[in-house]
Structure formats: C-alpha cells, structure tokens
C-alpha cells in the first residue's frame, strides 16, 4: 500500500471535494482496489476487496499524521467503505459525519452522503468531465448557439448544475431513481439554477418523443448526448 501512503504524506490541504488517490486508474497495481476521497470535512477510503484491521489501522495512522500537520487541533473524520462481491458496507472510523453534508467543487455546492449507501452523491473521478462540460457550454454564449442538454443517468444532476451555471438554455435530467433526482433538485436550488432544469424519472413515462429527440440532437454535440453519471 506504499503508493497510498505516499499520496497521503504528500497531499496538500484540500478545500474542495476531490479524489486524492485513484488506485483503480491502473498506475499502482498493488493498490488497484483502493481510492481515497475528501468530502470536506470527511475522508472516505473505499476498498473493492476486504481490508484487514491491521491495514485499516495503518491507513488511519497515516491519515492522522498528515491531518495533524494540515489541520492542527482538528479531529480526523473518516469512514471506510468496502465494496465486494456486490455488497457494500460503510464504517465510521473516526470523528463524525455532518448531516446534512454539503461540499463544494469549483464553487458549486453539492449535497452528499458518505455515511451509508454505495454512492455518495458526487462522483469525484468525474471532476474533469464536469470541467469539460462547463468549457463546452461557455464557448457557446450567443442565443442561437446556447445548448440544451440531455443528462442521461443523471443521478444527482451535478453535470446539469454545471451546464446551467455555464449558460445552457435548459437541461433535462433523466434517471431511474426518484430519490437521486430529488437530491439533484436540492443541488440546483442551492446553486440558484433550478428554473433552468427539468427532472424525469424514466420509470414514470416514456423517455422522449421523436420531436424532443430531434430537438436535442440539433443543439448538442454527440459527446454531450452520451450517457454520463453525475
């Protein structure tokens, strides 16, 4: 686990929610099952195979050492999630988790939940994708070129919030989970862009009429119409 320990020891004090270590990226085969995220003020360690108590103690000690340097006097707050063979479990390892828990990414507020469930409300490994969407939409400020976005598998609609902040005319968010879309509505409201969005549970009615599909296809690039998680 040395690559993870090195990442912890060298990390700077994060302000935004961000991924600190991405073992699944393939650069460190011995740590391919691990990721470390920061959802301020909580650290989230995820393992895709069971971890021993000794391994967790070593990681916790590494976090404690670095956190005492980055935030002297502040309690280390962290949780461990194990995802293995289709099951997911989460343990509070230290401190506490805010409720409600809001984080920011490049000035955008998102509601997250790191204490239970498999997903946390914001996929930090898609931060670069959200930056791309922001740049794409901002590059089309004129009324005739402003895009309308179809956000498939929208989850909690982070891409929608970013697109609307960047100037999109409208975003339609589709997802099977009404609960996730409800959090998405909170995210839009918290960022002042609720008026520009609509939310559709794909189980409640047909996805889109033919005319609606034509309307979106005429205003979006192929890369924006592809399925993307928030």
Can you say where each PLM-predicted feature lies in the sequence?
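Non-catalytic substrate-recognition/targeting regions of SAM-dependent transferases
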Residues: 29-30, 35-37, 56-127, 131
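Glycine-rich helix-loop-beta junction characteristic of Rossmann-like nucleotide cofactor-binding loops
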Residues: 132-144
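Conserved SAM-binding loop of SAM-dependent methyltransferases across substrates and taxa
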Residues: 156-168
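Conserved SAM-binding motif I beta-strand of class I
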Residues: 170-175
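S-adenosyl-L-methionine
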Residues: 179-220
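A short SAM/SAH-binding and catalytic strip from SAM-dependent methyltransferases
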Residues: 220-230
